[in-house]
Design a protein with these regions (language model features):
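Active-site anion-handling motifs in enzyme catalytic cores
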Residues: 1-184
Length: 184
Protein backbone atom coordinates (compact mmCIF):
# COMPACT_ATOMS: atom_id res chain seq x y z
CA UNK A 1 0.00 0.00 0.00
CA UNK A 2 1.02 3.61 -0.38
CA UNK A 3 1.10 4.03 3.40
CA UNK A 4 3.43 1.04 3.76
CA UNK A 5 5.85 2.42 1.13
CA UNK A 6 5.78 5.93 2.59
CA UNK A 7 6.49 4.63 6.09
CA UNK A 8 9.09 2.00 5.15
CA UNK A 9 11.20 4.45 3.13
CA UNK A 10 10.47 7.53 5.26
CA UNK A 11 9.14 9.49 2.29
CA UNK A 12 7.54 12.92 2.25
CA UNK A 13 4.11 13.08 0.60
CA UNK A 14 5.35 15.16 -2.36
CA UNK A 15 8.40 13.26 -3.50
CA UNK A 16 10.19 12.99 -6.82
CA UNK A 17 12.66 10.25 -7.71
CA UNK A 18 15.93 11.02 -9.48
CA UNK A 19 18.03 8.22 -10.94
CA UNK A 20 20.85 9.68 -12.99
CA UNK A 21 24.32 8.20 -12.79
CA UNK A 22 25.74 8.76 -16.27
CA UNK A 23 29.13 10.46 -16.20
CA UNK A 24 27.98 13.23 -18.56
CA UNK A 25 25.48 14.51 -15.97
CA UNK A 26 27.28 16.50 -13.32
CA UNK A 27 26.68 16.28 -9.59
CA UNK A 28 26.07 20.04 -9.70
CA UNK A 29 23.24 19.59 -12.26
CA UNK A 30 21.66 16.87 -10.11
CA UNK A 31 21.92 18.99 -6.94
CA UNK A 32 20.37 21.95 -8.76
CA UNK A 33 17.42 19.75 -9.85
CA UNK A 34 16.90 19.02 -6.15
CA UNK A 35 17.00 22.75 -5.33
CA UNK A 36 14.50 23.62 -8.07
CA UNK A 37 12.06 20.92 -6.96
CA UNK A 38 12.40 22.12 -3.35
CA UNK A 39 11.29 25.59 -4.47
CA UNK A 40 8.03 23.93 -5.57
CA UNK A 41 7.68 21.99 -2.28
CA UNK A 42 8.87 18.61 -3.56
CA UNK A 43 11.45 16.43 -1.84
CA UNK A 44 13.88 14.66 -4.16
CA UNK A 45 15.06 11.13 -3.39
CA UNK A 46 17.86 9.32 -5.17
CA UNK A 47 16.59 6.05 -6.66
CA UNK A 48 19.60 3.75 -6.96
CA UNK A 49 20.38 1.69 -10.04
CA UNK A 50 21.26 -1.97 -9.62
CA UNK A 51 24.06 -1.84 -12.18
CA UNK A 52 25.91 1.31 -11.04
CA UNK A 53 27.34 2.74 -7.84
CA UNK A 54 25.26 5.73 -6.77
CA UNK A 55 26.57 9.26 -6.67
CA UNK A 56 25.70 10.59 -3.21
CA UNK A 57 24.95 14.22 -4.05
CA UNK A 58 21.28 14.46 -3.08
CA UNK A 59 20.05 15.07 0.45
CA UNK A 60 17.78 12.00 0.49
CA UNK A 61 18.18 8.55 -0.99
CA UNK A 62 16.47 5.20 -1.17
CA UNK A 63 18.75 2.47 0.17
CA UNK A 64 19.62 -0.49 -2.00
CA UNK A 65 18.70 -3.35 -2.37
CA UNK A 66 15.01 -2.78 -3.07
CA UNK A 67 12.36 -5.46 -3.42
CA UNK A 68 11.05 -5.37 -7.04
CA UNK A 69 7.45 -4.70 -5.98
CA UNK A 70 8.58 -1.95 -3.63
CA UNK A 71 10.67 -0.46 -6.45
CA UNK A 72 7.56 -0.41 -8.67
CA UNK A 73 5.50 1.18 -5.89
CA UNK A 74 8.16 3.82 -5.19
CA UNK A 75 7.72 5.02 -8.77
CA UNK A 76 3.94 4.53 -8.84
CA UNK A 77 3.36 6.66 -5.74
CA UNK A 78 5.88 9.37 -6.65
CA UNK A 79 4.98 12.79 -8.02
CA UNK A 80 7.66 12.50 -10.70
CA UNK A 81 10.65 10.64 -12.08
CA UNK A 82 13.85 12.05 -13.58
CA UNK A 83 16.13 9.36 -14.87
CA UNK A 84 17.91 7.41 -17.52
CA UNK A 85 16.80 3.77 -17.50
CA UNK A 86 14.04 2.30 -19.66
CA UNK A 87 12.22 0.19 -17.04
CA UNK A 88 11.50 3.09 -14.66
CA UNK A 89 10.37 5.09 -17.72
CA UNK A 90 7.91 2.32 -18.61
CA UNK A 91 6.72 2.11 -15.01
CA UNK A 92 6.21 5.88 -14.94
CA UNK A 93 4.27 5.89 -18.20
CA UNK A 94 2.15 2.91 -17.10
CA UNK A 95 1.09 4.91 -14.04
CA UNK A 96 1.00 8.34 -15.76
CA UNK A 97 3.78 9.61 -13.50
CA UNK A 98 5.32 12.86 -14.77
CA UNK A 99 8.84 12.32 -15.99
CA UNK A 100 11.92 13.75 -17.62
CA UNK A 101 14.12 11.23 -19.43
CA UNK A 102 17.88 11.41 -19.87
CA UNK A 103 18.54 8.75 -22.48
CA UNK A 104 21.92 7.06 -22.35
CA UNK A 105 21.13 4.57 -25.10
CA UNK A 106 21.45 4.85 -28.84
CA UNK A 107 24.16 5.10 -31.42
CA UNK A 108 25.32 8.56 -32.36
CA UNK A 109 24.35 9.75 -35.80
CA UNK A 110 24.98 13.19 -37.21
CA UNK A 111 22.11 15.40 -38.29
CA UNK A 112 19.53 13.55 -36.18
CA UNK A 113 17.37 15.79 -33.95
CA UNK A 114 18.56 14.16 -30.72
CA UNK A 115 22.04 13.16 -31.85
CA UNK A 116 21.21 9.48 -32.19
CA UNK A 117 19.81 7.07 -34.69
CA UNK A 118 16.22 6.93 -33.32
CA UNK A 119 15.94 3.23 -34.10
CA UNK A 120 18.89 2.44 -31.83
CA UNK A 121 17.29 3.61 -28.57
CA UNK A 122 14.31 1.80 -27.13
CA UNK A 123 13.83 4.66 -24.67
CA UNK A 124 13.64 7.19 -27.50
CA UNK A 125 11.13 5.03 -29.36
CA UNK A 126 8.88 4.73 -26.29
CA UNK A 127 9.00 8.44 -25.44
CA UNK A 128 8.43 9.36 -29.09
CA UNK A 129 5.36 7.11 -29.34
CA UNK A 130 3.93 8.82 -26.28
CA UNK A 131 4.55 12.25 -27.82
CA UNK A 132 6.80 13.26 -24.94
CA UNK A 133 9.97 14.40 -26.69
CA UNK A 134 9.74 17.71 -24.78
CA UNK A 135 10.45 15.61 -21.68
CA UNK A 136 13.47 13.90 -23.26
CA UNK A 137 17.15 14.43 -23.95
CA UNK A 138 20.04 12.21 -24.98
CA UNK A 139 23.56 12.35 -23.57
CA UNK A 140 24.91 11.89 -27.10
CA UNK A 141 23.67 15.41 -27.83
CA UNK A 142 24.69 17.40 -24.74
CA UNK A 143 22.96 20.55 -26.00
CA UNK A 144 19.62 18.71 -25.69
CA UNK A 145 20.01 18.28 -21.92
CA UNK A 146 17.59 20.62 -20.19
CA UNK A 147 18.55 22.95 -17.40
CA UNK A 148 17.31 21.99 -13.94
CA UNK A 149 14.63 24.71 -14.17
CA UNK A 150 13.44 23.25 -17.49
CA UNK A 151 13.40 19.73 -16.05
CA UNK A 152 11.17 20.80 -13.15
CA UNK A 153 8.93 22.72 -15.54
CA UNK A 154 8.62 19.64 -17.80
CA UNK A 155 7.70 17.39 -14.89
CA UNK A 156 5.20 19.83 -13.38
CA UNK A 157 3.64 20.56 -16.79
CA UNK A 158 3.24 16.87 -17.65
CA UNK A 159 -0.13 16.00 -19.18
CA UNK A 160 -1.24 12.95 -17.16
CA UNK A 161 -4.54 12.61 -19.02
CA UNK A 162 -2.81 12.45 -22.40
CA UNK A 163 -0.39 9.86 -21.04
CA UNK A 164 -3.22 7.70 -19.71
CA UNK A 165 -5.10 7.93 -23.02
CA UNK A 166 -1.99 6.98 -24.98
CA UNK A 167 -1.23 4.05 -22.68
CA UNK A 168 -4.80 2.78 -23.07
CA UNK A 169 -4.63 3.19 -26.85
CA UNK A 170 -1.36 1.28 -27.01
CA UNK A 171 -2.80 -1.49 -24.83
CA UNK A 172 -5.78 -1.75 -27.19
CA UNK A 173 -3.47 -1.88 -30.21
CA UNK A 174 -1.39 -4.58 -28.55
CA UNK A 175 -4.44 -6.67 -27.64
CA UNK A 176 -5.78 -6.38 -31.21
CA UNK A 177 -2.42 -7.42 -32.63
CA UNK A 178 -2.24 -10.44 -30.31
CA UNK A 179 -5.81 -11.45 -31.18
CA UNK A 180 -4.96 -11.24 -34.89
CA UNK A 181 -1.89 -13.41 -34.35
CA UNK A 182 -3.94 -16.00 -32.48
CA UNK A 183 -6.48 -16.15 -35.33
CA UNK A 184 -3.87 -17.23 -37.87
Amino acid sequence: SKEYIMEKFGLDENYVLVSVDHESISAEWEKQVEVEFAKKNFTVYKLPQANKPAKHVLSHRIKFPIDPMEWYCLIKFSKGYVGELMHPVLCSLHNSIPLYVIDTYGFTKKREPYGINPLSSKTYQIISRFGLLDNYCNVNLPSSIATPVEVVSSVLGFNKEMCTLKANQMLGDYNNMMNNILMV
